[in-house]
């Protein structure tokens, strides 16, 4: 009887240690993934476009691409780039 109880307690202790190790590993992977996502976001924010594309918000300092024109469209409260009915030259 003492051996059976000792075996059950020992098995529970082993499962607790394994579970704790698995949880720590999962948390480390989650933190690494989050860090990787933040690095990708930072890299994409530093990449500047030379012009704004279709339905992109435009102003004087953010011009539209050659085949778009900046127009105010109701009910949108800001200017957007719309097609000026021309095609870009290749």
UniProtKB/Swiss-Prot annotation:
InterPro entries the record matches: Huwentoxin-1 (IPR011696)
Subcellular location: Secreted
Propeptide residues per the UniProt entry: 20-50
Record-annotated disulphide pairs: 51-65, 58-70, 64-81
GO MF, one annotated term: ion channel inhibitor activity
Keywords: Disulfide bond, Ion channel impairing toxin, Knottin, Secreted, Signal, Toxin
Coiled-coil region list: none
Signal peptide range: 1-19
Protein family: Belongs to the neurotoxin 10 (Hwtx-1) family. 13 (Hntx-13) subfamily.
Record's comment describing the protein's domains: The presence of a 'disulfide through disulfide knot' structurally defines this protein as a knottin.
Stated role: Ion channel inhibitor.
The protein's name in its UniProt record: U7-theraphotoxin-Hhn1b
Species assigned in the record: Cyriopagopus hainanus (Chinese bird spider)
